[in-house]
């Protein structure tokens, strides 16, 4: 137990408070922050991407570049504040899948407890629904690809709920077009209707027809959120997704004709023509023509006039 006495592990306390009784340091150490080497159910993980990215983009915090083995924070460690740049962030196995949008690689985190430069705090923004820590240095294991089903099987073997946080893994996989993973999650209890059927909306918005199809096969509601799925497919020009959604019950006149409005706005001629055949009323056609004139899209206007 003597190895703990020189290890700076604190929970939202200034570094100068570390000069207290050794028993108190031990209490902080054993009661909350570190059970990873003493309890089989406390396992830490981190999600990383291919390259360092700032928090306003998809990726990990700030400018740390991560590799297998010992990683040391490139700037001075900060003991106060939340989501600050002075520290390497990670969480435990029960929370790791809540941070999927930070990258595509899962890494096991071990703590260099014997390293005198090791400092660790629990982030003050941590709550019952989302817990994270940061440390001055950590030991990262090999990368496991979160796009691979085998990685999720590994997490399941540790008792991780792979449908955590309103089925975030399903919504994440659908938004990125990971068909095999989407099917695996659905076959293992994921709720296709989670978050107001967000999975099918995200897959439609990002153009993944095969994912849209399997979600609908498993019962996804294509009319959810005021037919958001078809609206986004019309906006981004995904003709086949628009057709599939309409043939499976999506409303081409949803939200006061928004599908044809947005398709016309973005000049998606094939979609505009398809939508016009769903409602041959002059009101619908005139609406599209007005938008084409406003945008001076004479090519599309010609299509509308001749259709």
Swiss-Prot record:
Transmembrane segments: none
Matching Pfam families: Ank_2 (PF12796)
Gene3D superfamilies cross-referenced by the UniProt entry: Ankyrin repeat-containing domain
Keywords: ANK repeat, Repeat
Secretion signal span: none
SUPFAM superfamilies reported in the protein's UniProt record: Ankyrin repeat
Residue spans of the ANK repeats: 135-164, 165-194, 196-224, 226-254, 256-284, 286-307
InterPro entries linked: Ankyrin_rpt, Ankyrin_rpt-contain_sf
Domain of life assignment: Viruses
Protein name: Putative ankyrin repeat protein R229
Organism the protein comes from: Acanthamoeba polyphaga mimivirus
């Amino acid at each position: 137990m003597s190895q703990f006495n020189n290890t700076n592990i604190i929970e939202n306390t200034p570094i100068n408070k570390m000069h207290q009784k050794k028993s108190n340091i031990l209490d902080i150490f054993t009661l909350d922050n570190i059970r990873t080497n003493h309890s089989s159910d406390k396992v830490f993980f981190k999600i990383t991407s291919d390259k360092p990215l700032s928090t306003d983009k998809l990726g990990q915090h700030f400018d740390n570049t991560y590799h297998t083995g010992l990683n040391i924070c490139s700037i001075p460690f900060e003991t106060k504040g939340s989501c600050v740049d002075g520290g390497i962030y990670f969480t435990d196995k029960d929370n790791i899948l809540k941070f999927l949008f930070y990258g595509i690689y899962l890494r096991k985190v071990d703590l260099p407890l014997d390293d005198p430069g090791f400092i660790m705090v629990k982030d003050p923004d941590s709550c019952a629904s989302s817990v994270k820590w940061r440390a001055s240095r950590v030991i990262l294991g090999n990368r496991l690809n979160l796009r691979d089903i085998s990685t999720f099987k590994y997490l399941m073997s540790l008792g991780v709920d792979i449908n955590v946080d309103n089925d975030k893994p399903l919504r994440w996989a659908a938004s990125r077009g990971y068909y095999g993973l989407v099917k695996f999650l659905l076959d293992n209890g994921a709720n296709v209707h989670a978050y107001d059927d967000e999975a099918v909306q995200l897959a439609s918005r990002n153009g993944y027809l095969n994912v849209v199809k399997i979600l609908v096969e498993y019962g996804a509601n294509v009319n959810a959120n005021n037919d958001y799925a078809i609206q986004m497919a019309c906006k981004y020009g995904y003709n086949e997704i628009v057709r599939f959604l309409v043939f499976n019950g999506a409303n081409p006149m949803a939200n006061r004709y928004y599908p044809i409005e947005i398709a016309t706005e973005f000049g998606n001629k094939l979609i505009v023509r398809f939508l016009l055949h769903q409602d041959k009323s002059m009101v619908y056609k005139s609406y599209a023509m007005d938008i084409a004139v406003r945008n001076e899209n004479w090519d599309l206007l010609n299509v509308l006039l001749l259709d």
